[in-house]
C-alpha cells in the first residue's frame, strides 16, 4: 500500500519560518553580522560594553540595508560605502574579516548547499563541488547572493571592529553618523534613479464590466510548476504540456511581480494585486496573512470552495485555505507524492477552485542549477504527472466544464536557480489555459501579469472580483458563448458515438 503524503507538521511550519530568517537576504545580514560580532566578543576578552555599543552604532546601517537591497547591477555600488568606511576607520582586524568570509563560505556552500539540501531533498554529499560555482553566479534576493552580501557585512564589521577596539568609542560617533547618513542618501539616490526594471503596475482596479454575465466554467484547476523557467519548459521533453499549449491559449509574455519570491508571487496571483497592497513582500512574512481579499475569500462568501495544496510557506499568506504538504522529501519522489495526494484531496473536498503547487523543478534549480540536464529531467517528470492528473480528471467527467491552467509563479536565474530581483530567466513565466471554454491554438503576445490570475478565475467561476484586484481579466482566451455551446455539444455527441 502506498503511503499518503504527510502534511507539513507544526514543527516544519515553524522551522520554515526560522529558515527564512537566514535565507532571505534582508534579514540574514543583521543576523549574520550580530552572530559574527558575538563570536568575536567571546574570543577577545569579553568587552561587554564595547560589544553592545558597537551593535547600537550599527543599527542605522542594519535598517538602511534592510530597506535597500541594491539588486542586480546595483550591488556593485555597495563597494563604495565600504571603501569610505575603510578610509574613515582604517584597516580593521583582518582576522575578523577573514573569519566572517570563511563562515559565510561554510554557511552557503557546505551548510546550505550541501548538508541542508541532502537532508531535506536528498541531493548528493558532493553537491558542494557544483554549487560553489552557482553561488558565484547568483543574483537573487537571498543570503546566497555573494556579491550583494559580501560588501554589506564587511562594511558593518569594519564599523563594529572600529568601535569595539576604540579606547574611547564615543569619539567615533560623528564618523559613524556621517557614514550612516551618507549611506542612506547614497542608497536612496541609487534606487531612486537607477532601479528602473520593476514591472509596471496596473494603476486602476480591474473593471468589473469585463466579467461575463454567466459563469464560463464549473471548476478551475491551476497547476503551478514552481520555479519553472519558461524557455527551459519549451526546450524540455514535455509532450503533454506542449500539446495543451497547442490546443489552448498561451501567454508568451506573462510577467511575474517584484520581488519574485514564492510567497509574494502566490499572494499576487490569488489576490490580483501587488505586494504594496496585499502586504506580503518576501518569503519572510512578519505579519501573517494577506491584507486584502483573496479569491478564496470571494468563493467562500458565495458558498463555493477554493483550496491551495502547497508548501508550508504559503500558510503564512493564506492561512486555513492552504492544505499543506511536507517539503522534507526526496526530490525524485516529492512531486509524485504531491500529485497522488492531490487526487485524494480533490476527491474528498470537491472544490470549485483547486490549486496544486509542484516543487521538484524549483528545488532542482536551487540545488543543481537550471542550465543542467537534471532541471530538464524534472520538467519531463512534471509533464508526465500533470498528464496523469489531467487524465484522472477527464475519467471523472470533470474536464467537460473545467478550465485547466498551467503556470509558474516565477522563473529562475542562472546561479542557484535564484529568483527575486528579476534577472535573466526570472521575469517571464510559462502560462497557458485549456478547456472547452478556452480558445484553441491561440497565442497572446501582449504583456500580461500574474496579477490577472485571480480576476480571470472570478470570470470563469462567475463570482465577484477580489476587492483590490488590479489585473485585467484574460478575456482574450475565452471562446464566444455561441462557439462554446456548439463545440461542447459536438464534444458530447462524439463521446456518445
Where are these regions (language model features)?
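N-terminal signal-anchor transmembrane helix
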Residues: 197-218
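Metal-dependent active-site segment of extracytoplasmic phospho-/sulfohydrolases and closely related
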Residues: 221-224, 228, 240, 381-423, ...
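Active-site His/acidic residue clusters
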Residues: 317, 343-384, 388
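Extended, compositionally biased non-globular segments that define protein topology
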Residues: 1-154
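Active-site rim elements
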Residues: 285, 415-416, 438-447, 463
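Phosphate/adenylate-binding glycine loop and adjacent helical scaffold
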Residues: 482-497
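Alpha-helical membrane-embedded segments
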Residues: 105-109, 174-195
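Active-site-proximal alpha/beta segments of enzymes that process anionic O-linked groups
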Residues: 105-137, 216-217, 227-350, 453-455, ...
Amino acid at each position: 500500500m502506498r503511503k499518503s503524503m504527510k502534511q507539513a507538521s507544526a514543527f516544519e511550519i515553524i522551522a520554515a519560518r526560522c529558515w527564512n530568517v537566514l535565507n532571505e537576504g534582508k534579514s540574514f545580514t543583521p543576523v549574520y553580522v550580530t552572530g559574527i560580532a558575538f563570536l568575536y566578543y567571546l574570543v577577545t576578552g569579553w568587552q561587554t560594553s564595547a560589544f553592545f555599543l558597537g551593535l547600537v552604532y550599527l543599527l542605522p546601517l542594519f535598517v538602511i540595508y534592510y530597506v535597500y537591497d541594491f539588486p542586480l547591477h546595483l550591488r556593485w555600488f555597495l563597494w563604495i560605502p565600504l571603501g569610505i568606511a575603510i578610509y574613515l576607520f582604517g584597516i580593521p582586524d583582518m582576522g575578523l574579516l577573514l573569519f566572517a568570509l570563511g563562515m559565510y563560505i561554510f554557511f552557503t556552500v557546505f551548510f546550505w548547499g550541501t548538508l541542508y539540501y541532502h537532508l531535506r531533498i536528498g541531493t548528493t554529499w558532493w553537491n558542494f563541488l557544483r554549487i560553489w560555482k552557482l553561488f558565484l553566479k547568483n543574483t537573487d534576493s537571498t543570503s546566497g547572493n555573494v556579491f550583494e552580501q559580501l560588501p554589506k557585512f564587511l562594511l558593518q564589521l569594519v564599523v563594529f571592529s572600529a568601535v569595539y577596539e576604540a579606547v574611547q568609542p564615543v569619539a567615533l560617533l560623528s564618523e559613524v553618523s556621517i557614514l550612516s547618513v551618507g549611506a542612506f542618501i547614497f542608497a536612496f539616490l541609487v534606487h531612486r534613479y537607477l532601479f528602473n526594471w520593476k514591472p509596471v503596475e496596473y494603476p486602476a482596479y480591474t473593471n468589473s464590466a469585463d466579467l461575463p454575465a454567466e459563469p464560463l466554467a464549473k471548476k478551475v484547476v491551476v497547476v503551478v510548476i514552481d520555479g519553472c523557467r519558461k524557455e527551459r519548459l519549451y526546450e524540455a521533453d514535455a509532450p503533454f504540456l506542449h500539446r495543451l499549449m497547442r490546443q489552448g491559449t498561451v501567454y508568451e509574455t506573462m510577467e511575474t511581480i517584484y520581488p519574485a519570491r514564492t510567497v509574494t508571487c502566490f499572494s499576487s496571483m490569488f489576490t490580483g494585486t501587488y505586494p504594496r497592497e496585499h502586504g506580503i513582500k518576501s518569503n519572510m512574512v512578519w505579519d501573517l496573512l494577506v491584507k486584502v481579499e483573496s479569491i478564496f475569500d470571494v468563493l467562500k462568501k458565495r458558498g463555493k470552495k477554493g483550496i491551495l495544496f502547497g508548501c508550508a510557506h504559503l500558510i503564512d499568506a493564506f492561512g486555513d485555505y492552504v492544505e499543506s504538504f511536507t517539503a522534507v522529501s526526496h526530490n525524485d519522489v516529492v512531486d509524485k507524492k504531491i500529485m497522488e495526494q492531490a487526487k485524494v484531496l480533490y476527491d474528498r473536498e470537491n472544490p470549485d477552485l483547486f490549486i496544486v503547487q509542484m516543487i521538484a523543478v524549483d528545488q532542482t534549480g536551487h540545488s543543481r542549477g537550471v542550465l543542467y540536464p537534471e532541471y530538464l529531467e524534472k520538467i519531463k517528470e512534471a509533464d508526465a504527472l500533470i498528464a496523469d492528473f489531467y487524465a484522472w480528471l477527464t475519467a471523472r467527467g470533470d474536464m467537460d466544464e473545467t478550465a485547466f491552467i498551467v503556470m509558474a509563479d516565477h522563473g529562475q536565474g542562472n546561479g542557484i536557480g535564484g529568483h527575486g530581483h528579476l534577472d535573466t530567466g526570472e521575469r517571464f513565466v510559462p502560462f497557458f489555459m485549456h478547456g472547452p471554454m478556452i480558445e484553441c491554438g491561440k497565442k497572446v503576445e501582449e504583456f500580461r501579469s500574474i496579477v490577472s490570475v485571480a480576476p480571470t478565475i472570478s470570470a470563469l467561476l462567475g463570482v465577484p472580483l477580489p476587492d483590490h484586484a488590479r489585473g485585467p481579466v484574460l478575456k482574450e482566451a475565452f471562446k464566444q458563448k455561441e462557439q462554446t455551446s456548439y463545440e461542447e455539444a459536438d464534444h458530447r455527441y462524439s463521446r456518445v458515438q
